[in-house]
């Protein structure tokens, strides 16, 4: 059994579904919210689509890793619940993260997704009047920030897919021996 092919085929099928999901979410969001165009790399609508797609794919890759590590469905659901709470707590949206919390946030999908969405929509300048704490490098409306966020989302996805394959391969090899 070629476990890499199994993991990659699952990831590919998920990606195909997520392209449709990202398109639906983006079109719905853009039509309801009327997002101002910032045009860092592409039209803001396209940047939002790419960000949502990368967030969905990185989240699915994390799910693949969880399902590879935990054989029991009940355990996997509990782990996913903890991961979902972590997405909110370590996203950098609720409060400023420092120290260990900042380090944990560096592997959180939501943190990089929110950073990319904030960069695409120039969240810093658009919400400055609120003084809501959104001003910061996380939401800098720069090409470098946007690309950095996208790269981190892609890296998280790649690491999770490779880790899922390695976990399955090690488990398979142990059962064979």
Locate the predicted segments by residue.
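Membrane-spanning alpha-helical segments of multipass transporters and channels
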Residues: 1-177
């Amino acid at each position: 059994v070629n476990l890499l092919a199994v993991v990659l085929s699952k990831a590919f099928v998920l990606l195909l579904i997520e392209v449709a999901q990202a398109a639906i979410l983006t079109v719905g969001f853009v039509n309801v919210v009327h997002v101002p165009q910032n045009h860092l790399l592409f039209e803001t609508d396209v940047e939002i689509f790419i960000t949502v797609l990368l967030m969905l794919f990185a989240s699915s890759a994390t799910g693949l890793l969880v399902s590879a590590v935990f054989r029991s469905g009940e355990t996997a659901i509990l782990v996913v619940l903890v991961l979902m709470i972590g997405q909110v707590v370590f996203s950098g949206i609720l409060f400023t993260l420092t120290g260990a919390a900042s380090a944990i946030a560096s592997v959180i999908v939501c943190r990089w997704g929110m950073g990319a969405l904030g960069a695409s929509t120039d969240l810093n300048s658009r919400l400055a009047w609120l003084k809501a704490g959104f001003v910061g490098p996380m939401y800098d409306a720069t090409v470098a920030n946007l690309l950095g966020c996208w790269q981190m989302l892609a890296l998280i996805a790649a690491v999770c897919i490779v880790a899922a394959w390695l976990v399955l391969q090690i488990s398979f090899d142990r059962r064979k021996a």
